[in-house]
Amino acid sequence: MASPAVLAAKAALASVDLSKYDPEQSRLMDERCILVDENDIAIGAMDKKTCMYCHLMDNINKGLLHRAFSVFIFRPSDGRLLLQQRASEKITFPDRWTNTCCSHPLDDFEAEKNEKDQLGVKIAGSRKLEHELGIPQSQTPIGQFQYLTRIHYLAPSNDMWGEHEVDYILFLTRDVTVEPNPNEVRAYKYVNKEELKAMFEDPSINFTPWFKLIARDFLFGWWDELLKRKGSDGQVVAQSLADLMDDRVIKMA
């Protein structure tokens, strides 16, 4: 039997019209998210068209929560971070700057449900890097993603939409070919730490809430360690941070 939270989300379907949004972004709502509890235990699946209504601010407090990931790609030679600006067509957080790629593992793909060594979210990360940024999956081998932790956060996008996720943080150090999908990505650039801090201080630049939370509490410390732990060839290597992995679900506020 469906939980009260799921029933509430389904009931909301009648009240929101997706036809006013970009057709491709609306089509992607048919993908099935993985629903989890606050301990990141999978409890079912729901297509985004329904799951999206756990993103309605009216429903967020009713308990729907889903699994997500945030990938951070650093250039090996200089440790610069690849950022993207989300496309104007995005339903949530359009035009905001964020980390390299943020999305969801899907129940549609058996491999993306694999929880051993975070394989499912790593496979999903490689898939979405290609979809959003045109980075060939051959350039993002699953074994080179470094998992660091999971965060549980809640954030509004506007008066109607919000976000409520258990988000896996993945670092990757690779030279990649970027050919953005314009329906997903408006712009992209590589930045060093000082340039990113300057962006955060610029009131004209808007960021996604999860990126701001990760940067506030974790990113710059991890980044410092990444730069300190360069290999003998002078390049940064994500796996050098393996000892910093924290497998708790960290509740962010």
What are these regions (language model features)?
Residues 32-34, 71, 188:
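Generic short beta-strand
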Residues 42-44, 82, 167:
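Generic structural signal for well-ordered beta-strand positions
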